[in-house]
Regions:
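A short acidic, Gly/Pro-enriched loop at the edge of an enzyme's catalytic core
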Residues: 42-54
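Conserved Rossmann-like nucleotide-binding pocket used by diverse enzymes
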Residues: 11, 37, 54-55, 86
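A short glycine-rich, Lys/Arg-flanked "PGG" loop and its adjoining helix->strand segment in the class I
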Residues: 69-81
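C-terminal lobe and adjacent flexible extensions of AdoMet/dcAdoMet transferase-like proteins
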Residues: 149-160
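C-terminal alpha-helical "lid/dimerization" subdomain adjacent to the S-adenosyl-L-methionine
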Residues: 3, 69, 86-129, 133-148
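Class I SAM-dependent methyltransferase SAM/SAH-binding core
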Residues: 1-43
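A short SAM/SAH-binding and catalytic strip from SAM-dependent methyltransferases
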Residues: 53-67
Length: 160
């Protein structure tokens, strides 16, 4: 991301110290300057309106439904008005074989955590968190199910 957009400031957050260390090592190998912070998606350690973009990859399916909703609301909170969320995560399997493959993910991460994904409801959850213009840009068949790439925009604040 930073290579495609020189001058962008990159921040990463994860609750797992091992994942943070892995991210730091990957950034260092790639020669990318980034800031990594330990924290939880449901209570991000950043002020309101701190970012222009929030990007998440294969994260939301790990969360329980209430935590998923809280994390999406937090993403909206830390975005500036007009800021964008970009998510790549599991979506509704696009056929019987992909439904069967996705069963492995559901067994590992929990049927409750992945129910909204299996039903294709992640875009609805993003909208319910306050994002507008939510759309799915691409769907990819993988060895573990169907990966959806979607985005939404935090609406501009209403003028008084």
């Amino acid at each position: 991301m930073k290579g495609a957009c020189p001058g962008v400031e990159v921040s990463g957050v994860d609750a797992d110290p091992w994942m943070l260390a892995t991210a730091v090592a990957k950034a260092k190998r790639a020669g990318v300057e980034a800031t990594f912070t330990r924290g939880f998606a449901e209570s991000l350690p950043y002020p309101d309106g701190a970012f222009d973009r929030v990007v998440s990859g294969l994260f939301f399916h790990h969360l329980a439904p209430d935590a998923k909703a809280a994390a999406l609301r937090e993403a909206a909170r830390v975005l500036v008005p007009g800021g964008e969320i970009h998510v790549a995560d599991w979506g509704r399997p696009s056929g019987p074989l992909l439904r069967l493959l996705f069963l492995g993910v559901r067994l590992l991460d929990g049927f409750g955590n992945t129910a909204a994904h299996a039903a294709g409801r992640l875009p609805v959850l993003v909208e319910e968190a306050g994002f507008a213009g939510v759309r799915t840009h691409a769907r990819f068949a993988t060895a573990f199910g169907t990966l959806d790439v979607l985005s939404g925009v935090k609406p501009a604040e209403a003028s008084a």
